[in-house]
Amino acid sequence: MGNLRRTNYCGEVSLANAGQEMTVCGSIARARDKGGIIFADLRDTTGILQLVFDEDTPKDVFAKAESLKSEYVVICRGKLRERAAKTDKIATGDVELYVSELRILSEAQTTPFELRDEINVNDDLRLRYRYLDRRRPSMHAPIVLRSKIMQIIRSYFCDNHFTEIETPTLIKSTPEGARDYLVPSRVQPGHFYALPQSPQLYKQILMLSGFDRYFQIARCYRDEDLRADRQPEFTQVDEEMSFVSEDDIMTINEGLIKRLWKEMLNIDVQTPFVRMPWDEAMGRFGSDKPDTRFGLEIQNVTEVFKGTEFKPFAAVLEAGGTIRAINAKGLADKLSRKNIDKLGEVAKTYGAKGLAYSRLTADGTSSSFEKFLSDAEKAALYAALNAETGDVLLLVSDTDWVKACTALGQVRLDIARKHGLIDPDKFNFLWVVDFPLFEYSEQEGRWMAMHHPFTLPKAEDLDKVESDPGACHAVAYDIVLNGVEMGGGSMRINDPALQDRMFRALGFTEEKARESFGFLMDAYKFGAPPHGGMAYGLDRMVMLMLKKDSIRDVIAFPKVQNAGEPMSGAPDVVDAQQLKDLNIALTLKD
């Protein structure tokens, strides 16, 4: 760089700086030789500034400018002037830099794809050349904004008496939850660490260590099959508080959301958020993370069909089941029979045996079931669903009300997405509360903790933890935004006797509980304050704030569907000596 040192960033200059001498540096986004005058767009982490080389430019500098190509790295000095032909395509479109000194710091080969936002690029190619993809403004900005979001989070917690504490990332593997990533110990042959799925146990022990309020922006790892919104390694905004109630935790976190949305998006979020019990969320929306930006709410029409002679419904009701419905109001012209058949496939994917329908059009009603109903049943159904000409009624029956509602909930979402019922500019927050404490695993043949084994049961359910696990609810809460679970938490058990009962309800022997969680159980013996906390997926939070379609867009180097990282080639085979040092022998399946 010689004696040149940056004095300004490209994206931060304006008309207020016109007439100033300055030095800027970055990469050439593109260069255009107009014959006697050369324009070049210089890009740095803040934005783009147009460089100008003309007849007044020193000859040696102009000669260098003639060699400029895309992605050459340069530093240059010159005078900032007001542009004659202004543009609103870039933030600095009112000014340009007339260059008097230029140094080419690094040349560049032709890139495998153009680094412009308007160019569609194959995802595999983008991930292979992630460092190039991140130079594009639309891919660069989310990482910068993510950093600002993290700064606000840290500032907010520090302002509210939290202490930032780092917990270990080489920990003991414990049961429950997803599969652990394991790390072999070289110094203790045959022993393994696990990478943390969350700092859960350590943050609870911090409360038992006298730290009143803790937070951490933590790296976490889960060896599970990937979905669109999941990564094997992810970042979690983690928090825990002592001497608080569920209400206190919600208030603190509503304040965090309020500050983030105001400082990042200049949006005033209204608090407190709606609190919706889990049973209500499932019953009305068919989801424990309901999207409340649109209607199409699920209705319970079981009473309408009491005594029905329509055999499919009658059989379900005889078995103690339920019939649920939604009214796709005014969509009869858009939901053809073919469309409804596709919705039926959606319902079946989520466990429904079928999707009954009625299309109410000006030409009459077409239905898969109405001819089997009495006039009284039809009238009662129409009244219950406020049905009128132009509507489509969709019904699911099942012996399991959760399954029926879940299937209709997915149908509801499919209709809304395909028919423009969702306002993309809305941010609808709510709390889902009073989750079931347990869920039964047919595969395991036992009750499992819906969240984790340390979740506090509701006071009215304490006597039922072992005798009737399915009837127990938890002091647990999820914060939901636009149909996405952004974070969740609970109050924790701080009574050793209750924790022992919880372990027994989950099928743990005393020996197994002590083997897995003995260090936590020992800590409880020395006095444990009431405590609770929350955790957010930072990647998902940033994705929602910036309205991105995938968390890959807000992670610098994301993994793909097979948990690989295309740019570096991870994971990879390792040297035989490394395996020998770790006392590991491989037995690979063909």
PLM region spans:
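Class II aminoacyl-tRNA synthetase catalytic cores and aaRS-like
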Residues: 1-590
